[in-house]
Regions:
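Conserved catalytic/acceptor-binding region of the Class I
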Residues: 119, 130, 134-142, 148-227
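A short SAM/SAH-binding and catalytic strip from SAM-dependent methyltransferases
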Residues: 104-118, 160
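Class I SAM-dependent methyltransferase SAM/SAH-binding core
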Residues: 40-44, 48-97, 120
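N-terminal, positively charged/glycine-rich alpha-helical extensions of SAM-dependent methyltransferases
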Residues: 1-12
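C-terminal helical/coil "lid" or tail adjacent to the Rossmann-like core of SAM-dependent
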Residues: 214-276
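Core SAM-dependent methyltransferase catalytic element
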Residues: 284-292
């Protein structure tokens, strides 16, 4: 993950709630590739390191650079990854980092939408990937046949929020930010996320020089088990950039009030108020691309 405010994430809670959503996505992305076990990989926005564990197991003879800018996430990742000697944990923005070697794979799960400048990110990634002729003559570094085909080249394996992501949730959040109680706190509000379109992303990749790209959106509406888990997920992940603006002497009370209003809106907009479904309307942007 990549974040605006260093040390601003509740990494311990994120470590718990992300098992229900982000961890599942990360496992799916790992299956896009036929792994050989000796790849040099960057986990761009590793968060608490949960999916980095699985990535490290994929490359026992390789190396994983687990990169995140948030100090709390880095601390949690160190705790989660202490048993792996093929993982190096680095606190940095993944668009500014300088690594000592070129990469076979750049993996990123639920992080790229925190970066506003995707052109810069993809250009940085391009510069970090090995060109084909220096790729150690691997016979096959492609992805599974239902993705981008088998191509002997370095590659991106990325999933993040895409165009339309959380639109229903954002609509409810904006009702609260525009309310009399909270309008003043959000007068200079700018959305922290950039949810890109698939066509725009594919065009950008090709302009930089990537080949054999496969870029597509898919909807993934997630239903969380109950009010308590949903509330923790919203507070820790979805509403985080909104809650950060409520930093005053009464910050905790304001955040509690904001969350209560949001949950009230969810209940009010439920089609069956006697049996509320705690839904998250995700849209995922899936990206596989190769550096020739």
């Amino acid at each position: 993950m990549n974040y605006q405010n260093n040390g601003s994430w509740d990494a311990r809670t994120y470590d718990q709630v992300s098992y229900l959503v982000q961890y599942k996505w990360g496992q799916q992305v790992l299956e896009w590739r036929k792994w050989h076990g000796n790849e040099i990989v960057m986990d761009a926005g590793c968060g608490s390191g949960l999916i980095t564990k699985q990535l490290a197991k994929k490359v026992p003879r390789g190396k994983v650079y687990a990169v995140d800018i948030d100090s709390n996430m880095i601390k949690q990742a160190r705790n989660n990854l202490q048993m792996f000697d093929n993982v190096e944990i680095i606190r940095s923005s993944f668009t500014d980092i300088k690594l000592p070697q070129k990469l076979d794979v750049i993996f990123s799960n639920s992080a790229l939408h925190w970066i506003q400048d995707h052109r810069k990110a993809f250009q940085v990634f391009w510069d970090m990937l090995k060109p084909t002729n220096s790729n150690n003559k691997n016979k096959d570094t492609g992805v599974s046949s239902n993705n981008a085909g088998n191509v002997s080249s370095s590659q991106l394996l990325i999933q993040c929020g895409g165009f339309g992501n959380l639109q229903q949730i954002i609509t409810l959040l904006e009702r609260i930010t525009n309310s009399d109680q909270f309008r003043a706190y959000f007068k200079n509000w700018k959305q922290s996320w950039y949810f890109a379109k698939s066509d725009d992303t594919d065009k950008l990749l090709k302009e930089i020089g990537y080949v054999n790209s496969r870029v597509y959106l898919n909807r993934d509406c997630v239903s969380l088990p109950n009010h308590r888990i949903y509330s923790r997920f919203i507070k820790t992940v979805v509403a985080k950039p909104y809650l950060e603006l409520l930093s005053s002497d009464n910050g905790d009370k304001l955040k509690t009030a904001f969350l209560k209003l949001f949950l009230d809106e969810v209940k009010r907009n439920s089609s069956n108020r006697s049996k509320i479904r705690w839904l998250l309307d995700f849209v995922r942007l899936n990206i596989v691309a190769h550096r020739p």
